[in-house]
Regions:
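Terminal low-complexity/charged segments
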Residues: 1-151
Length: 151
């Protein structure tokens, strides 16, 4: 079983760089966005809340694996440092998490939507997303072109 470690966003980039260099965690297996809900007074001290990310890292040298969790309780402007300068594979995944959860990755070279249209309002994987608040209108256009023999 792999170790699971929580890191505050402010220390994330430095700690990930340390894991890459000192622990030889050279392979980013996955990076997944999460919405653990709103923090509550009755939560146990070790319960993760807010919007965040889980990183699964592996060392191809030692075979060691670790999962890193980080989160922010700021639901209005959630920000987490980018690790795309450490693992290039994070580039695509961070854009996906931004698209679906609205988490902005500080330092990312191209932080824009990946799957959803630019005029899409909200982030569909968040627990506070209510698709009933807006009407989504799809407009499909199809151009027909008649091809006549001999022309």
């Amino acid at each position: 079983m792999e170790e699971i470690k929580y890191i505050e966003p402010a220390a994330l980039h430095d700690e990930m760089l340390r894991l890459r260099n000192e622990k030889q965690m050279d392979f980013l297996e996955s990076l997944t966005g999460m919405d653990w809900g709103v923090a509550d007074e009755g939560d146990a001290p070790n319960v993760t809340r807010g919007l965040g990310v889980v990183y699964h890292l592996e060392s191809t040298v030692t075979g060691e694996r670790i999962a890193i969790k980080t989160s922010t309780n700021n639901r209005e402007t959630p920000e987490i440092p980018s690790v795309s300068d450490i693992w290039k594979a994070a580039d695509f995944n961070e854009r996906e998490v931004f698209d679906y959860y609205g988490i902005v990755f500080i330092g990312h070279p191209d932080m824009r939507r990946l799957y959803l249209r630019n005029d899409w309002v909200g982030h569909p994987m968040r627990k506070d997303n209510n698709p009933g608040e807006r009407q989504i209108r799809y407009v499909w256009t199809m151009k027909r072109r008649m091809i006549r023999p001999g022309k």
